[in-house]
Amino acid sequence: MTSIIFSAKDIFEQEFGREVRGYSKVEVDEFLDDVIKDYETYATLVKSLRQEIADLKEELTRKPQVSSAPSPSHPDPIDVAASSSMTNFDILKRLNRLEKEVFGKQILDNTDL
């Protein structure tokens, strides 16, 4: 691919030599030829980028969609840990109550000794 010759600053700062009847026609024509080449390069570049975008969009539509939400068959490990720790805590509380009911009198009797 051809390279771009002028920047916007180059075009803005371009000066032409003066002749009796105005600017040098040859200089202006050469400059405009180069500007035209730049515009053709830009057009080619834009066309290739648009084609690349279209190709990427098509490729994206062909790929299966991946959901960002976790699937029900694979629960979130943090949720599982939190719910199991709550379950363990509840079990420990119940076990403590049962021990107090069953062994409470024995514990009180042993403290009197």
From Swiss-Prot:
Disulfide-bond pairs as recorded: none
GO biological process, one term: cell division
Region listing for Disordered, in residue ranges: 61-82
InterPro entries: Cell_cycle_GpsB (IPR011229), DivIVA_domain (IPR019933), DivIVA_fam (IPR007793)
Gene3D superfamilies recorded: 6.10.250.660
Keyword check for GTP-binding: no
Superkingdom: Bacteria
Coiled coil: 37-63
GO cellular component: cytoplasm
Signal peptide start and end residues: none
Record keywords: Cell cycle, Cell division, Cell shape, Coiled coil, Cytoplasm
Pfam families: DivIVA
Its biological purpose: Divisome component that associates with the complex late in its assembly, after the Z-ring is formed, and is dependent on DivIC and PBP2B for its recruitment to the divisome. Together with EzrA, is a key component of the system that regulates PBP1 localization during cell cycle progression. Its main role could be the removal of PBP1 from the cell pole after pole maturation is completed. Also contributes to the recruitment of PBP1 to the division complex. Not essential for septum formation.
Family the UniProt entry places it in: Belongs to the GpsB family.
Subunit organization: Forms polymers through the coiled coil domains. Interacts with PBP1, MreC and EzrA.
Name this polypeptide is given: Cell cycle protein GpsB
Source organism per UniProt: Streptococcus pneumoniae (strain ATCC 700669 / Spain 23F-1)
Taxonomic classification: Bacteria, Bacillati, Bacillota, Bacilli, Lactobacillales
